[in-house]
Amino acid sequence: MSGNTYGKLFTVTTAGESHGPALVAIVDGCPPGLEISLADLQHDLDRRKPGTSRHTTQRQEADEVEILSGVFEGRTTGCSIGLLIRNTDQKSKDYSAIKDLFRPAHADYTYHHKYGVRDYRGGGRSSARETAMRVAAGAIAKKYLASQGITVRGYMSQLGPIEIPFKTWESVEQNAFFSPDPDKVPELEAYMDQLRRDQDSVGAKITVVAEGVMPGLGEPIFDRLDAELAHALMSINAVKGVEIGAGFASVAQRGTEHRDELTPQGFLSNNAGGILGGISSGQPIVAHLALKPTSSITTPGRSIDIDGNPVDVITKGRHDPCVGIRATPIAEAMMAIALMDHLLRHRAQNADVKVNTPVLGQL
């Protein structure tokens, strides 16, 4: 199966299935000398791991990462970094009844047609379990970006019909929803409790922000930074849409409103989301992700079996009623991986470029 590697100079390759023995990642291109520890990686993995609240899947995975190579005495060596996370709480018997059925809105049907064989246990390769390795790799990218003065942070901005206004970054890490507004948490909890009683699921929107990004990242024409970010973020399971900056709201804006005017003191707005002409402007890079409702629900759904016969499918097992609740660390990881790749690419070609024009911030 191709398509398992992301990046050009900083690359991340993952392998593994939901119910296999382990998940694996090879991270290549990280410069030598970066201080990195298991704790750096484990922090973000703990933010993503399942079973941390009643609102997520109750599959209990420690998600303890092992560094197999590329790090010596606490520093990267410049060689490939091998990462491993062992699966410890698989319940494959939950899926035996659907091995010859196609779950509605899952990858079962498309994997069957593409490969002629599929691992039906928990979705196999198509499961969001794979994203644990992205988060581990993304933690390396975040550590490197931090050494360059760049931070990547995310939060939930909408769950189902509930819009969540941004208040403080401090609130994001203090609740299970990654909500930036603590006053919204009781409403979110009540909504999820009712959703569970209804045996249904719901979608969400995640916002990711990168601050401290220097101007110049991005490679026109086909490797524009916004196109690369959309690629990276759209590769996350259940993501059905990505916006950069004002995104689809740009349709209703006029040019006098949408254009981000410049003054000697800084930009007056950031509708472009920190990217102009496919190249970073030095403003915060802002992206929004729309995630669909979880397809694995206990309410019967119409489908077919491998012979084309009509069937009703009830998906058993342990599933997230809203995949968006655990998606924030994944979105942060993919943005960080994309930005690190482009930072290294920019330095490889343009490290000696100097201009006298000041770098503007945002007012």
From Swiss-Prot:
Binding site for FMN: 125-127, 237-238, 277, 292-296, 318
Cofactor dependence: FMNH2
Pathway listed: Metabolic intermediate biosynthesis; chorismate biosynthesis; chorismate from D-erythrose 4-phosphate and phosphoenolpyruvate: step 7/7
GO biological process, one term: aromatic amino acid family biosynthetic process
A cellular component annotation (GO) from this entry: cytosol
Catalytic activity: 5-O-(1-carboxyvinyl)-3-phosphoshikimate = chorismate + phosphate
Protein name: Chorismate synthase
Source organism: Pseudomonas putida (strain GB-1)
